[in-house]
Amino acid sequence: MAAAATCFRFPAMTGMEIDIEKNIQRKRSTYQSLDETFDIQNETYRGQQYSQIYFARLHLMRTLLYSLVTHWKPHVPVCTVLGLEEGKECIIVGTLYKHMKLKPCVLDEYSKERSAVPLVKPHNFMHPDDHLVLEDESGRVKLGGTVLSPSKYVTGGVVALHGKETTAGDFLVLDVFEAGLAPQIEPQLKSREDKYVVFVSGVSVGSSTSNPLQFQLLVDHITGHLGDDQEQGIAAEIVHVVFAGNSVEIPSGLLNGQNLASKDQSRLSEPVQELDIWLTQIAAGVSVDIMPGSNDPANFALPQQPLNRCLFPGSRAYNTFNLCTNPHCFELDGVRFLGTSGQNIDDLKKYSEARDELEFMERTLKWRHLAPTAPNTLGSEGQLVRLISVPKFCDTGIAVVLNLRNLECHTLSFGAQFSP
């Protein structure tokens, strides 16, 4: 789908003080949604256990790792957990499981002793006593040594380990091999001129920290109603906008499963109505994607399905308005994008450690759990991926802008203070 063209008109003064309308044409781009993988048409999870997901993942990733370890350690034999022999070096492939002392358990909520020992609810569940286990269909073995750090890995990762069984029955890890970045389609940077994609996250319309004026400044900048002719020329180069989740915040206490009074129903719908007004202004001139987030009125489990169209009576009138899944995948002028609203990274932050969010994102690529193939992380085979972490707009007033010509990024910062 091609983004709609928009004209900006403003008066230009000549020496004879005659007003002349100057037109600025918004640039076009070619958009294609690739959300079919995440679009659930029918119920598919009924009666399934999590173990089936792990076994399916292990089967897929093990086949891949078997083909790669022959180049990694060609002279070291590959065996299963059950086939380990004490002191004999080998390679085992399996799913990591992380034993965590502070990890919450649903049974703790119903424990008889819970009143005597309060539940621990930290933001991070790391503990010095945490350890890793590797599991395949034949069994599981505790991992030892200093090569494999429990603080880096989480449950669910599939890796190949070089090591040997100790007298205590543990597996002493000597080296670790991860799948690495997936084979990449040839990056096609078709654009020879500057075209920009704007990413916004955590607008949180309706929250106590949301600043309507700050959001309106963003909308006015995108639509070309802010600034002089130079600013409007920059706005005309914006060809796509992505709202990456948590666009609204419903007042707490209203969604408790009870029948709502008419006054409460109005409070419940006000944030969505306000968001629709702003999105309508943007969709009138540029293509817009809106993804659901953890605070939005959508299903909770991933993949989250698109928000209901009935929530946006104004925006849905434009064919430039796209309701998307989370994760969301699309192509724009030959560049492929894959992103989430952040739940996967938030979970990694609870159960492991890293310098920043970008390092967590890089790990998902190396583990191939969520591996985009769009173009600065460099793989061993020359793969190039641009990682973008978008801050919460209602707290920072910052949006992220990507140039389709060279994949360079910069930020847009909006500030607004109310006078007392």
Regions found by a protein language model. Give the residues of each.
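Extended recognition/assembly regions associated with phosphoester-bond processing machinery
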Residues: 1-420
